[in-house]
Amino acid sequence: MRFFLMQRNHQVAVIDIAEKTGDIIDVAEVLSAQRIPLGAKHSDGSFDVLSLRKWWAGRGIPASRSGLEHALEALHIPYAELLLVKCSGLSLSDQYWVTPCDAPQNWHDVNFYENDFSDDVGRALFGEGILSAQPDLCSPCNTSDGFLQKRWRIADGKRILLKAGSGIYKQEPYNEIVASALYDALGMPHVPYWLVEQGGQVMSACACFTNEHTELVTAAQFMRLLPQAQGVSNWEHFNACCQAVEIPDAREAVCNMLAADFILANTDRHLGNFGFLRDSETLEWKGTAPIYDSGTSLWQMTLTRAICAEAMVPAKPFETSQQSQLKLIAPYVDLPLERLDGFSNKVEEIFQTAAQFDDGRAAKIAAAVSGRIQMLRFNRA
């Protein structure tokens, strides 16, 4: 089937998508080179069907998503990639989508910012019963990434992302609350999170931070702005891209975020978990995105007895250990750490409500956070 790849109402390319699998099989024509998704380019800046296919596949629900297999069965969908076609590739992160060449649609009539969407896919992803014999598959849940169970819902006109916990402690939702409290204390722009209970489990909730005019460009996508020369580190290349488009204070904002990640022992700040905001109509860069997705942190998969501030913690995205990454960013970190006096009490208070915790876990995490704050202060001295 032949489609237009679109950005809002701008035609970007003519592409062919396999009807049975949902895979992109050809790029017939590029119509607007400047609007090609940055993430759909190779690292050398080139663009072809292989790079577009990789971008398209990465847009969908990953195979690692908890409960995906059962959800596909309930929705009568053989391949997860087909869910992308069912929702026209629409997302609540950006304004790219596809529409049939022989029956093109208008962006304003279909996008998830201005139009309601079904909860059928969200229900299936959480193992809930489908309310219709013919489920409505047009949902932003189809273009949500990550391995944790999650779903988009509409509440009071707002688009809200709900995300569950994992493992024996189900800790990730509480981690988001701790992270929000940390960012509040330090005066850092971030996406606010709160807790909700649904179906007997506690989940984190946050409102969509993009809109019909503004898109998220992750750091991984952003770094395709320029070809990355062999031997140039990701850190060096990231800074070169920031300088090329003159985003003010981008390096300092990212370094402050990574310093906060050190406090939180965040192990998953990969290049898709932070980024920049761009006007999807003018393509003007608006600045760094607020910090989001900090749940994989605070020793969430570590047994209570093994939690320790000094333990080696892996890091992303520019170094493999927290200590080595801290050395890299230290010259650019400017956080008012004096505001964190007594912050460990707040951490323990938040975790005291976690039903899956064993005795002493909340206090152990709070003590480790306090220790890491002191370690960061020492590195700053």
Question: What is each residue range found by the language model?
Answer:
Residues H270, G275-L277:
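Conserved protein-kinase catalytic-loop segment immediately C-terminal to the catalytic Asp
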